[in-house]
Swiss-Prot record:
Protein name: A-type ATP synthase subunit B
UniProt key word Membrane: yes
Any GO MF annotation of the entry: proton-transporting ATPase activity, rotational mechanism
Membrane association type: Peripheral membrane protein
UniProt xrefs under Pfam families: ATP-synt_ab, ATP-synt_ab_N, ATP-synt_VA_C
UniProt organism field: Saccharolobus solfataricus (strain ATCC 35092 / DSM 1617 / JCM 11322 / P2)
Length: 463
């Protein structure tokens, strides 16, 4: 660790950045203390150092910082936050300062928030089902313990509500007492941050949730620190306290916009869409901190949530996120306009690991077959809607009309559910069987006969 060094030669102040001359030994992400002439102290991080100039990103912003009379101290270490189990049920900013008028964290250990992605050789393959209580996720795009499964939303879609509902309901069945949620609100508007806080407090979910919050009006560096602090806490709870942790990061678009703002202030050559060329690497250092480690009981499951600008799934942020993570849950504006909550487009959604965490001994023996049949039948229902719009519903065959009915029931009964409705996987699969029963049995080609005879409403009623 480097010793503390003091400098006073500020060559330039630009946006959230301070340029300090005469620095030859600064480390990347080194913590800096800035003492102003009036005695006020601020903190920052070194984000670049070359040709004797260190660029410092100031946490509290540079308003009021004077080029003369200001002392810059390089502290010789990274940003460390005191981490503890006491943070569950509390709200903090990315620097570890309390935002709920509660006491500071007393017990715990200081940890550098710049953690590393998990070593691939140390990873254990995800195989255990996490029940979110959301049918469109549990039934068709299951989330597994240790998985990275993002939610792609659009502006004005109810991503906040869905994130809060998952944070309240998600659990590893049989290990409910050992489950915790680390909720990172990145660059949140004040009313959104207040919504999350009130929701968790009123539902009692706050007891197992630790909130790390940065607001929209804070400097960009605070937004880039938020997921790092949240994941440092998640790592401590998972790998030191043996807890199953769900890390929800909302909104990663704000994180990427902060990266772009800092990059522009540094006058870097922009990459695709004006975002820095290293954004893919930067996102990977966050997403790859999730997973299961061989020999450890705990795990980190990650659900990053992002807003697709102009609902464009090919935009750099969702595009790069999709490359790194293991699937995506896509919210759909057309479903939202039909009054369906959550408006999850199951045909565009995917969980790449789902097949390994469902079925006999994990959820229910018919889960895989029912999931495959629901996908296939809904895809045909959507195609049939397009056909009906051209030739008219009266020209459709009897079977095609039943697929139209199935599509409507699928959206209204299976995908749509109440904000406070927590469905077990058994309830989800039973609803799936109920709506599949409107189709002729001969159409259920993806389901084994033994499951049809065991779970189909026509047979269950005869037992």
């Amino acid at each position: 660790m480097l010793s503390v060094r003091e400098f006073s030669n500020i060559s330039m102040i630009k946006g959230p950045l301070v340029y300090v001359q005469g620095v030859t030994d600064a480390s990347y992400n080194e913590l800096v203390e800035i003492e102003m002439p009036n005695g006020e102290r601020r903190r920052g991080l070194v984000i670049d150092s070359q040709m004797g100039i260190a660029i410092v990103q100031v946490f509290e912003g540079t308003t009021g910082v004077s080029p003369t009379g200001t002392k810059i101290r390089m502290l010789g270490r990274g940003l460390e936050v005191k981490i503890s189990e006491e943070m569950l049920g509390r709200i903090f900013n990315p620097l570890g300062d309390s935002l709920d008028n509660g006491p500071p964290v007393i017990k715990g250990e200081k940890r550098d928030i710049n953690g590393s992605p998990l070593n691939p050789a140390a990873r254990e393959y995800p195989e255990e089902f996490i029940q979110t209580g959301i049918s469109a996720i549990d039934g068709l795009n299951a989330l597994l313990r240790g998985q990275k499964l993002p939610i792609f939303s659009g502006s004005g879609l109810p991503a906040n509500m869905l994130a809060a509902q998952i944070a309240k309901q998600a659990t590893v069945r049989g290990e409910e007492s050992n489950f915790a949620v680390v909720f990172a609100a990145i660059g949140a508007r004040y009313d959104d941050a207040l919504f999350f806080r009130k929701f968790f407090e009123e539902t009692g979910a706050i007891n197992r949730v630790a909130m790390i919050v940065s607001l929209a009006n804070e400097p960009p560096v605070m937004k880039t620190l938020t997921p790092k602090t949240a994941l440092t806490l998640a790592e401590y709870l998972a790998f030191e306290q043996d807890m199953h942790v769900l890390a929800i990061l909302i909104d990663m678009t704000n994180y990427c916009e902060a990266l772009r703002e800092i990059s522009a202030a540094r006058e870097e050559v922009p990459g695709r869409g004006g975002y820095p060329g290293y954004m893919y690497t930067d996102l990977a250092t966050i997403y790859e901190r999730a997973g299961k480690v061989i020999g450890k009981k705990g795990s980190i499951t990650q659900m990053p949530i992002l807003t697709m600008p102009n609902d464009d799934i090919t935009h750099p942020i969702p595009d790069l996120t999709g490359y790194i993570t293991e699937g995506q849950i896509v919210l759909d504006r057309a479903l939202y306009n039909k009054g369906i909550y959550p408006p999850i487009n199951v045909l565009m959604s995917l969980s790449r690991l789902a097949k390994d965490g469902i079925g006999e001994g994990k959820t229910r023996d018919d889960h895989k077959d029912v999931s495959n049949q629901l996908f296939a039948s809904y895809a045909r229902a959507v195609d049939t809607r397009g056909l009906a719009a051209i030739i008219g519903e009266d020209s459709l065959s009897e079977v095609d009309r039943k697929y139209l009915l199935f599509g409507e029931l699928f959206e209204r009964k299976f995908v749509s559910q109440g904000f406070n409705e927590n469905r077990s996987i058994e309830t989800t699969l039973d609803i799936g069987w109920e709506i599949l029963s409107v189709l002729p049995e001969s159409e259920l080609t993806n389901i084994k006969t033994q499951y049809i005879q065991k779970y189909h409403p026509n047979y269950r009623g005869k037992k």
